[in-house]
Amino acid sequence: MQGRLSRRTRCAGLALGTALLMAGCAGPRVQQSQSSGAGLESVDGATVSLAAFENSAFPYHGMIPNYQETGKTRPFLDVDENGRLGHSSPRGGIHWEDQTYSDRSVLLAAPQSFDPAKPGVIIVFFHGNNATLSRDVIARQQIVRQLADSGLNGGLVAPQLAVDAQDSSAGRFWSAGGFAAFLGEAQSKLGDLYPNARGAFRRMPVIIVAYSGGYLPAAYSLAVGGDQGRVRGLVLLDALYGERDKFVSWAEGPGRSAFFVSAYSASSRAGNDAVRAELEAAGVPTVNGLPGQLTPGVVAFVDAGSVDHNDFVTSAWGGAPLRDIFSRIGG
């Protein structure tokens, strides 16, 4: 899959995240922020920046609600080794805060065709496990290119979650109002990039997109994040692995005035089948495949077939599923 990347994309990813890429080739070390010293770049038909946020997903020193869906809470940082704090992940062992949960970077991007005078949207993208913004979200998964190629008028914001780790922790998105605080800062920083669009960004509806382990911050953003009235769309890419009740509750309630698309491979088929059955039992109509337009009330499930989960974002139908989905969204 790496062979598909354009030379321009690879170079831009290196420019934005050189320190991180070098860290991936070395042994364990303290995580450096991808936003350190990063300015504006032109990447794949979009203007891109990596900015440090106060309301980033991490660092996070709070509790994990509904730990492993048991209804119980526990401290997120539950390991202290001579003052070095860490989180014991049920799948990935111990992840140290200084390596995995200290990067405040957030990807900001808008197509070069972006026009603040026209209707637009803000896309919030939650990446999956074992990912960084520069190496994976920009370069490998081509999220920026897919947005630019779709023709959708809007801005993209993607917070760094657990850095290059097998962990889906939501961090501050677990907190009540965490999503609203993040969104408020995001629209302000997008306004810094496009001063003439400050007012437009404050009014734009929001589309949440989650791939794989990004389901966890997405679920809590919908359930307790605040500003749910601005969320006019939810896109899950092979992501229904847990917290199904939160997605169902949203689709039955606030989501009635939004659209909901869940595309899946065999990896998350069981979760999708379960959510779809619950929604239909509650009287929420669903459709197979993508309709021509994604309008309020659309609930679509897309079976992508035998696609490798790790390559889903660039291999599902046509090789650019987000480009296809974004192209069906009205501003």
PLM-predicted stretches and their roles:
Residues 199-212:
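Alpha/beta-hydrolase fold nucleophile elbow
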Residues 13-23:
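Bacterial N-terminal signal peptides
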Residues 119-122, 126-189:
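Active-site machinery of serine-nucleophile hydrolases
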Residues 25-121, 154, 287-288:
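A domain-start/cap signature at the N-terminus of enzymes
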Residues 182-202:
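Conserved acidic catalytic loop of the alpha/beta-hydrolase fold
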Residues 215-226:
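Short glycine-enriched nucleophile-adjacent loop
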Residues 228-239:
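A conserved short beta-strand
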Residues 262-273, 280-331:
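C-terminal catalytic histidine-bearing segment of alpha/beta-hydrolase fold enzymes
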